[in-house]
Design a protein with these regions (language model features):
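Bacterial Sec-dependent N-terminal signal peptides
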Residues: 1-23
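A ubiquitous, low-specificity "background" feature that marks scattered single residues
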Residues: 8-9, 106, 201
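Charge-rich, well-structured scaffold segments of protease-associated domains
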Residues: 20-36, 59, 120-274, 301, ...
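Hydrophobic alpha-helical membrane context
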Residues: 14-15, 112, 198-199
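His/Glu-rich zincin catalytic helix
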Residues: 5, 20-120, 158-161, 165, ...
């Protein structure tokens, strides 16, 4: 049989080669190649993916695993990762939460980084500490991250030394352990708002070691376990045979490997090997479960399924990737199917894959429809009918998305032609390599060549068949390891299991004709029109005034009030950048019509050059539109291209033809969002957010009544008025183009834009101003545990002047205040998990700034903690808390985060317009001004904020 198959393959190849000599029609050639490819699928599936040869990996005599990969990127940074097998599932009953507790203690002092030196070292390297950005504990592992560190040799050595300390030399003083207990409690408190989501995940895991244990642990254990219990857990499991060191970045791999061997080689091998992760419990029939959600007014019907294990293909082969890609594709197909079922009763649809626990082979898929609570039966039945119909009948060619990309194959299409990527530094980003390596260590999988793996995935995606999709779907929805989850708003009574089961049973008994949804042709959105297909022949405007500013720049004021700026500047490929900015934006809409701001782009769109699409972008205080033209030669085609671009400007700016289908979709989305926002807890949260503002009308979502009044008819009225005046608009033409030659076209298409006697202007509303008196507000909400979300807003508007130096001071204030808050109310007092500090400033609509501090805490301590925060801010302004080291850390962080500047035309053109319209250009990454910040200048800036601004304190609390 094998010989016959090989002979048949050879014959096919000969036929194909002969045909290629005779006929070179590309379409026929592609068809023949596709036929050959499908004939050889079984052979390609067995092809082994080459192992990676670029990662230096090994295991020391003591059992510690290391991975080092040189990976050059423009930022020249290095990512360090310390991995430990065994998360919360290896805890004993009296240790629930200790694995996570140990993770916290790694930042409270080690042998070579005592006290707070670990956090201080990270700060000096520009790395922020807090939340899960530096470490996190999972069910089966713990990870410590030192990402984007400088490739300085001293920093590299220090990072390796810190990871060595984490491996065996954490100090864990009794005093530090006691101070960290409440921090963990506060972290747990902040997560309880998502408790119902965790309960839903547990239904999929359905295994005691995962359901009964959670990484954050039991708070009774966290509060009362002895320091000895914590230290014993650390010594028992933090042993070399359970650990790995990963270094990826701009380093010399050989040098780093040598340093790892020297630094970690003398650690003693332990006796405690983390056992394999327990297998999940299997259920042969679906389970029906009910949950309450206090954050949504909607009901959700969901089918949650654990993906079947796939043991058919040999690991490390191309075929081993097929199941993964089939299910990924299946998820996308189901999203399309469910989205097509949305109507007045079904307001939400979702299809997604998830990995609830970091265990190899455990993945889930969810299909979900949302409705109003009274329509729960309709939602469940619709979902069940669609799933049952597809289970019986499978997918069609129309359902399957076509993938155009194929990898390269060998000449006879019997194998993928894998490119040689040996020792290629620039293949893949640091994060991609770290993820690949981490999975290899925890799951025991081999490291495969990254480019070859992606080529294999391309092959799989391009050869997925409807039969494979249908078979995978049937296995997925056969009822095994499936949960039917019905989630209702808090306070709504659950139906019975029998009611749900009866609906599912009735659907199973339906005939195909009953299962098939009546197909109604969806209304179509307006098609984009080519500008040459539209009669565009406006009456040209005239020149009112010409001003020559210098040899490169001249300004021309047109009769309709548009100012045209010609900037003679040589761009690549004879490029011409044209950019229009109207200084109005949707600030012109009244409070009552503000919700239509999201629909102003729902108009007929135009294109030129067959593929160039663009639309007017309505922003809060500007309406912008820009295009770029280029040509190898300044010939007739060059000028045709420029005229078509200018036609695009005219057509796009003047059309009032509303796309009613697109607008209706946004209106429906807005109405659903209004219903979602009607929940008491959401409204309370929004009121706290709006506390500093004079008015919340343009900041809060619309009410259900307001959203119900939205209409396409009113949008049409607004669009006609909104695009009726371009007096005061700036139009920039940048490029090496002759002004006299292009002027007639500019007069015809820009000079003819509609205008009114008065130029446009930016409007101010109540929501654009901060309150001028201090305020305090308390809002109540429900939560499974006592919780208070506190927000302190320091605002300054009257007398505030914004320039680049002030922006640098605001950036520094955010960094320094954030560090001091972390040190004071988390590290020293243990009152909160991680406070967040954000400083924002605005030039428009009025110069102003806001310093927002937020955190979660125990409701009974909210006033005391808020007073501590206020006292800290006052001490910063009056004392010596702002040190040079804190400012230096801020500057290093700015340098680390700054992206390399890419020369181009967009930046200079935007700067010119911003300077012309706003009088100043403000950058977010001006290191020159950042480096001018000093402790004294920052202190003086904060004093002004406290003296001239106001303070607004909001508590969102359960009691």
């Amino acid at each position: 049989m094998k010989r016959f198959f090989l002979a048949m393959t050879a014959s096919l190849c000969c036929v194909a080669l002969f045909a290629q000599e005779k006929d070179h029609n590309p379409s026929d050639l592609k068809q023949r190649n596709d036929s050959l490819l499908m004939a050889h699928l079984d052979i390609i599936e067995q092809q082994e993916i080459p192992l990676d040869t670029t990662v230096r990996q090994g295991v020391l005599k003591n059992g510690l695993t290391y991975y080092v990969r040189r990976c050059t990127q423009s930022d020249k940074k290095v990512d360090f990762t310390f991995l430990v097998k065994g998360g919360c599932i290896i805890e004993k009953d009296n240790e629930r939460g200790v694995a996570h507790f140990v993770e916290h203690m790694m930042f409270k002092g080690t042998k070579h980084f005592p006290g707070q030196e670990t956090i201080a070292f990270m700060g000096r390297c520009g790395l922020k500490f807090g939340h899960d950005s530096n470490a996190f504990t999972d069910y089966t592992n713990v990870r410590y991250l030192l990402n984007s560190m400088p490739n300085d040799e001293l920093v590299v050595d220090s990072c390796l030394l810190l990871m060595r300390d984490w491996a065996c030399d954490a100090t864990m003083d009794n005093k530090d352990i006691e101070s960290e207990r409440n921090v963990i409690v506060e972290e747990w408190r902040g997560r309880t708002s998502k408790a119902y989501q965790m309960s839903i995940v547990n239904e999929i895991l359905n295994t005691p070691c995962y359901v009964d244990w959670t990484p954050i642990g039991d708070m009774d254990v966290v509060k009362n376990c002895s320091p000895k219990t914590i230290r014993d857990f650390y010594k028992r499991w933090y042993q070399p045979q359970n650990q790995a060191v990963v270094v990826v970045g701009d380093i010399d791999a050989d040098e780093v490997v040598a340093k790892i061997k020297k630094l970690f080689g003398n650690l003693k091998r332990g006796k405690n090997v983390v056992p394999p992760s327990p297998a999940l419990h299997d259920e042969e029939s679906p389970r029906i479960r009910f949950f309450s959600n206090a954050t949504s007014p909607y009901h959700f019907s969901a089918m949650m399924m654990r993906l079947p294990a796939d043991d058919a293909a040999k690991e490390n082969t191309v075929g081993a990737l097929r199941s993964e890609q089939v299910y990924n594709h299946l998820s996308g197909l189901m999203l399309n199917q469910l989205n097509g079922m949305k109507d007045k009763n079904i307001v939400y649809a979702a299809s997604a894959m998830a990995k609830p626990v970091e265990v190899k082979g455990i993945e889930t898929m969810i299909f979900e429809l949302g409705s109003k609570p009274d329509d729960w039966k309709k939602a469940l039945e619709k979902l069940a009918k669609r799933v049952e119909y597809l289970r019986r009948n499978g997918f069609t060619d129309d359902d399957k998305v076509k993938f155009a990309e194929h990898p390269k194959y060998n000449d006879d299409f019997t194998a993928i032609d894998f490119a040689d990527t040996t020792a290629v530094d620039k293949v893949g980003a640091r994060s991609s390599w770290t993820t690949l390596i981490t999975n290899s260590f925890f799951h025991g999988t081999k490291l495969l060549d990254m480019k070859s793996t992606e080529a294999s995935r391309e092959h799989i995606r391009s050869t997925i068949t409807k039969e494979q999709l249908s078979d995978a779907f049937r296995k997925l929805v056969n009822g095994r390891n499936m949960a039917i989850v019905e989630t209702f708003p808090e306070g709504v009574a659950f139906p019975t299991e029998k009611e749900v089961a009866d609906i599912l049973k009735r659907v199973k008994q339906m005939k195909d004709e009953e299962l098939a949804e009546a197909t109604v042709e969806a209304p179509k959105k307006l098609e984009s029109l080519h500008v040459d297909s539209v009669d565009i022949n406006p009456t040209p405007g005239t020149i009112r005034k010409t001003t020559v500013l210098n040899d490169s720049i001249s300004e021309v004021l047109l009769s309709n009030g548009v100012k045209v700026v010609f900037w003679k500047k040589k761009l690549h490929h004879n490029g011409v950048k044209m950019k229009l900015d109207r200084p109005m934006g949707y600030s012109a809409l009244s409070d009552e019509d503000f919700q239509y701001s999201k629909m102003l782009s729902c108009r007929r769109k135009y294109k030129y050059q067959a593929s160039t699409h663009a639309f007017v972008l309505a922003r809060p205080f500007d309406d912008v539109f820009d295009l770029f033209c280029s040509s190898a030669e300044k010939d007739e085609a060059y000028w045709t291209d420029i005229e078509q671009a200018l036609k695009m400007f005219y057509a796009s700016l003047t059309t009032t033809e509303v796309d009613s289908v697109a607008a209706s979709e946004i209106i429906t989305t807005c109405q659903n969002a209004a219903t979602q926002s009607s929940v008491a807890s959401v409204q309370a949260n929004n009121r706290i957010y709006c506390l500093p503002f004079e008015s919340s009308k343009r900041l809060m979502p619309p009410t259900v009544e307001e959203a119900g009044r939205l209409s396409v008819e009113r949008l049409r009225e607004l669009v006609k008025d909104y695009y009726s005046n371009f007096n005061g608009t700036l139009f920039l033409v940048c490029g090496d183009v002759n002004q006299d030659s292009i002027m007639p076209l500019v007069l015809k298409y820009i000079g003819s834009l509609p205008s009114k006697p008065e130029p446009v202007k930016r409007h101010l509303w109540g929501a654009d101003h901060y309150k001028t008196t201090n305020t305090t507000a308390v809002e109540k909400f429900s939560n499974p545990s006592p919780l208070c979300v506190t927000a302190l807003y320091y605002t300054w508007e009257k007398g505030f002047q914004l320039n680049q130096d002030v922006r640098a001071l605001n950036h520094a204030l955010q960094s320094v205040l954030g560090e001091l808050l972390l040190n004071r109310i988390r590290v020293q007092h243990g009152d909160v998990y991680t406070p967040v500090c954000q400083v924002v400033d605005d030039l428009l609509p009025v110069p102003r700034m806001r310093c927002a501090i937020s955190y979660t805490c125990n409701p009974t301590q909210r006033e005391r903690i808020a007073q501590d925060v206020k006292q800290l801010v006052n001490e910063m302004a009056e004392g010596n808390l702002i040190t040079q080291e804190l400012v230096d850390n801020y500057i290093k962080n700015r340098e680390s985060a700054r992206k390399p500047y890419e020369d181009g035309v967009d930046g200079p053109c935007s700067d010119y317009i911003e300077r012309e319209l706003n009088g100043i250009v403000l950058k977010n990454d001006d290191l020159t001004c950042d480096k001018k910040v000093t402790p004294s200048s920052l202190k003086a800036h904060l004093k002004q904020l406290l003296k001239k601004g106001n303070l607004h304190v909001g508590y969102l609390t359960t009691e």
